Amino acid sequence: MTRTRRLTHIAIYVALALVLHITESFIPVPFMVPGAKLGLANIVTLLVILLSGMYDALVVVALRTFLGSLLSGALTSFAFSIVGGVLATIVMALVYKRLGGVFGLVGVSILGAISHNIGQLLVAGVVVGTMGVYGYLPVLLVAGVATGYFVGIAAGLVLRFLPKALAESAAAGWPEDARVHHIARMR
């Protein structure tokens, strides 16, 4: 892949993740744990890990986290989000690469969501300066399983329909990415 094409893909991934991040702020989720979110932008992160690899996914997470914090005016949450996002991305990429066949897409996503919550909790422990915040861990683990399951299912649905959409765009003159077809066949 050329440098320009890679940069274009990253820009598209960041834009998609930002749209999902901003959209999520408008979705009322009354049953969620305080501080927990669905993590819709992580659908893109998971797809980038599969389609482009861990390093591109880390770039997407860093840019999406910074721009999302900037656009939402919540710069104080940047430290929480970046640590959680980077930890989740690394865990998902490593688990997918080494144990993807064992865990599947949903399992990888659940482990990523749990890692994200643990990363944020570590930052909270440093910021607050007390071990008391770690009492929140069991609640965040349950929330991580639920949100990770949702994100994994959503990413799986995207992967199911992505090859068809790419094939149609190739027929219309757009270049086709064979890696997407390979991943879709692995599912």
Residue ranges and their predicted role:
Residues 74, 78-79, 98-187:
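Membrane-embedded alpha-helical hairpins and interfacial helices in multi-pass inner-membrane proteins
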Residues 21-38, 63-93, 105, 127-132, ...:
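Interfacial aromatic-anchored transmembrane helix boundaries in multi-pass membrane proteins
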Residues 17-21, 68, 88, 92, ...:
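Alpha-helical transmembrane segments of multipass membrane proteins
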Residues 38-54, 91-96:
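Generic transmembrane alpha-helix motif of multi-pass integral membrane proteins
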Residues 1-48:
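Hydrophobic transmembrane alpha-helices
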Residues 7-12, 43, 47, 55-62, ...:
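Hydrophobic alpha-helical transmembrane segments
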